[in-house]
Amino acid sequence: MKKIVVLGSGMVGRVMAADLAADFEVTAVDVSPANLDGLKKTPVKRLRADLSDAAAVRDVVRGCDLVVGAVPGSMGFATLREVVAAGKDIVDISFFPEDSFLLDDAARKAGVTAVVDCGVAPGMSNMILGYHAARMSVERFECYVGGLPFQREFPFEYKAPFSPADVIEEYTRPARYVENGHVVVKPALSDVENMDFPEIGTLEAFNSDGLRSLLATMKVPNMIEKTLRYPGHAGHIRALRDSGFFGGEEIEVRGRRVRPLDVTSAVLFKHWRLHEEDDEFTIMRIIVEGEENGRPKRYTYGLFDRRDRTTGFSSMARTTGFP
C-alpha cells in the first residue's frame, strides 16, 4: 500500500488525511496534540513533530511515496523546500507569500513533481481555466470565491474555515491581477463590488492575491480573482489594517514589546473560530470568456457547498481537500 504523509493536521489537513486513509497508509504530522486528536477515530497514524524544523520535515517524509502539504502559509515555502530537497513528490495547499517557481530548478534536478496552491481557488479555478485555454482563445478570466458562516454575527460576520493567520494574510498581501496584458498591483480589500448569488443573496467581492501561478503560466490578457464576504466586512478590516492593527513591527505597551498583529490576531481568532456546530458554506463563481471555433463564447461556473452534518467535515475542507 502506498504511503502518504500529510504535513499539518488543522481544519483542512486532517480531513484530507482521513479521506486518503480509505485507500492509502496515511500519517498525519502536526506539532499540536489537539489537532492530532481530531484523527483519533480514523485509521490515520499520528505523529507529533515541529514542522518549522527543517530536519524534522525531512525526517518525517523519509520512506513515503507522496507528501500532502497543509501547513499555515507562514511555513509553507520553507516546508515545500525541504520536501523537494528530500526528493518527494508533493501536493500543497499552503497559501505562502513566496514565489513557488523559485524552487522549480531544484524540483527538476531532484525529479520531483510539486503541485502547489491546490485548493479551491487557487486550485480548482486553475484547472477550469486550463481546460478552456486548451480549447479556445481565452480573453478574460474572473474568479470570485469565499467561505462564510450561515449565521451572521456582528461586526465581521465571518468565521475562519482554515488557518486564521492565512485569512489575515489575504487582507494584507498586495493583490495582483492582469488588465490588458499587464500585471496590476493594488492593495488587498480594494475595488469592492456587490454581487448577487441565488443561494445566499448579496455578497461583496474585493481584490485578493489569488491568481498566484496563473500570472506566470497563462497568457490571458485579463484575469482577476476576488474574495467574497458579507457586505461591510471589507470596510471593517480596512479600518483595522489602515490603523496599524496588523502591523508586524514591535511596539512597547506597559514595558513589554509586542506586535500589533499578534494582539489583533489573538482577539480576532476568538471571534473567528469555526466551531464544529457552525454551519458554513463555500461559494465560487468563475467566468471564462473568449473565442471558440471562431465565435465569441462565455462560460460561467458556480459552486455552492455546505458542511456535511453526517461527517462533520466543513465545506471548505471538503472542497479544498477532496479530489
Where do the model's predicted regions map?
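N-terminal Rossmann-fold NAD(P) dinucleotide-binding loop
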Residues: 13-14
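Helix N-cap at the beta1-alpha1 junction of Rossmann-like dinucleotide-binding domains, i.e.
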Residues: 33-35, 97
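Conserved Rossmann-fold cofactor-binding substructure of NAD(P)-dependent oxidoreductases
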Residues: 51-63
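Rossmann-fold NAD(P)-binding glycine/threonine-rich loop
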Residues: 93-116
